[in-house]
Amino acid sequence: MNRALVLLLYVCTVSCLASSKVILMRNNITLSFDDIEANFAPSVKGTGEIGVVYVAEPLDACQNLMNKPEQSSNETSPFVLIVRGGCSFEEKVRKAQRAGFKAAIIYDNEDRGTLIAMAGNSGGIRIHAVFVTKETGEVLKEYAGFPDTKVWLIPSFENSAWSIMAVSFISLLAMSAVLATCFFVRRHRIRRRTSRSSRVREFHGMSRRLVKAMPSLIFSSFHEDNTTAFTCAICLEDYTVGDKLRLLPCCHKFHAACVDSWLTSWRTFCPVCKRDARTSTGEPPASESTPLLSSAASSFTSSSLHSSVRSSALLIGPSLGSLPTSISFSPAYASSSYIRQSFQSSSNRRSPPISVSRSSVDLRQQAASPSPSPSQRSYISHMASPQSLGYPTISPFNTRYMSPYRPSPSNASPAMAGSSNYPLNPLRYSESAGTFSPYASANSLPDC
């Protein structure tokens, strides 16, 4: 599109400079018409020629002209208006020159709308000759013969050095303007694109509203913990009493001014552990080194196991009275931290039922209560364990610490159960029923 514009401007400039003009001037009327000079006649020089136009007689000027130009007092030259046809252009011009006219204006006899260059022998031709259209000839014919009507023949610059320089200069100026416009438009687009991408690339921080929402504290003393408790990792200055510290979700502390500038202007993670400060969860984000089971999942599994053990202990407690096992409890052994295991031997005869002691009654009452206290739950879990109820366990761990003495129904007496001649290896229990398990921890082993 730019090249087409330059070419059009060039053509218009050349056409304007190459074509000569015929200017009609009368009082307040000024009309301009295009013409083209004859090849065999002298060209118009300088600023042009001014004269008065007359109509030729005969109009085609193929014969000697009957009318003669009138001598004017002012410096105007007589011009003759001739129609095309009947004879050659050269003959018409020679007849006009012989009659005393200074220029011959020949117009077309048909309305073709185009100008043609007249050709002929230039020998002996001393006057100017131009060709105009039929429309221009009709207008000039109306104003012919009036002394106050002037016709100005403007020369053509087609063959002059000035025309070549002017065309070259205007063409160069137009091309330079187009190239400069394209250059500045392209540069402006590149600057806009670069500034937009740089603004997006430079913004890495958080909003001040999110940073101010993080907890802050006033430093009072040094603490031994997992945080940066002595020196700010950003400015490398020691904390002093009264400094305002900002606490990130990863529990690292920094000067409030330092970490606020870091989070809002540079990055959104902790300068120490690289954890994203926009996350408020207690667990760090998952990575390749993250364990399969987190601490939250393990604590949930442990609490579920403790709850199941506690519920099974409460269910066993109320059914103590219906057990056919012979169990004897004494107040001394109820308050002791050791429980002796007794197993009933397999026999066909059933031992007579015995009365349940005070400890068993208390156990049933506490188990039947709707919401036992933590101390009661611990006591119930301890007294209602499978070992204290007489149920044998087949675990290899329990058989290792099982008493070698197996009482039979005939020798199951309180005296024998309370005797110290048969040492037992009881399990040590903890304060809560939820941790009573041989696989819970190493602390459950005896004398560890």
Curated annotation (Swiss-Prot):
Glycosylation sites: 28, 74
Membrane topology: Single-pass type I membrane protein
Polar residues: compositionally biased ranges: 408-423
Residues exposed to the Lumenal side: 21-163
Domain PA, chain residue ranges per copy: 60-144
Residue segments, region Disordered: 344-380, 402-424
InterPro entries hit by this protein: E3_ligase_sorting_rcpt (IPR051653), PA_dom_sf (IPR046450), PA_domain (IPR003137), Znf_RING (IPR001841), Znf_RING/FYVE/PHD (IPR013083), ZNRF4/RNF13/RNF167_PA (IPR044744)
GO CC annotations, alphabetized: Golgi membrane; protein storage vacuole; protein storage vacuole membrane
Annotated localization: Protein storage vacuole membrane; Golgi apparatus membrane
Segments on the Cytoplasmic face: 185-448
SUPFAM superfamilies for the chain: PA domain (SSF52025), RING/U-box (SSF57850)
Pfam families on file: PA, zf-RING_2
UniProt feature coiled coil, ranges: none
GO BP annotations, alphabetical order: protein transport
Bias (Low complexity): 344-378
Transmembrane segments: 164-184
Function: Involved in the trafficking of vacuolar proteins. May function as a sorting receptor for protein trafficking to the protein storage vacuole (PSV).
Full protein name: Receptor homology region, transmembrane domain- and RING domain-containing protein 2
Annotated source species: Arabidopsis thaliana
